[in-house]
């Protein structure tokens, strides 16, 4: 009720977008872009991963693909671990058509970059077969 009283001409989504942008969690800054995205830093990534994965799964770990499914189902965050499914969701939301580059390739690159960041943080390990496992003490 307070929100609608103070900001009668904006939606809650507009408020969250502005708040996220000013906090540095959402970008790019400015009004030049139609769609905003999460700007992943180590703290935000660690928080999101640890909130999505059950603690009892961490000692043995889960695959990056499973993390992608968890983030998709719990938070509607697409990281590119299943490019076909993620692209389909972006296409349904009419976001894929506005992307200037090869979106499927960008999704796969995004998943690799997130895996690399998790590895440098000590939350994941990539094995010789290319599978990345997220967990403790791997």
Summary of predicted features, one role per range:
Residues 58-72, 78-99:
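Short acidic, hydrophobic short linear motifs in intrinsically disordered regions
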């Amino acid at each position: 009720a307070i929100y609608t009283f103070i900001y009668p001409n904006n939606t809650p989504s507009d408020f969250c977008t502005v708040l996220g942008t000013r906090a540095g969690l959402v970008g790019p800054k400015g009004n030049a872009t139609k769609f905003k995205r999460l700007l992943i830093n180590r703290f935000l990534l660690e928080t999101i991963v640890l909130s999505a994965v059950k603690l009892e799964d961490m000692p043995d770990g889960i695959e990056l693909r499973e993390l992608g499914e968890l983030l998709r189902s719990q938070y509607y965050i697409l990281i590119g671990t299943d490019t076909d499914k993620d692209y389909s969701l972006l296409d349904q939301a009419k976001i894929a058509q506005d992307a200037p580059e090869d979106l499927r390739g960008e999704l796969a690159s995004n998943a690799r970059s997130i895996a690399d960041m998790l590895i440098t943080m000590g939350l994941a390990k990539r094995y010789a077969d290319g599978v990345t496992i997220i967990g403790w003490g791997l």
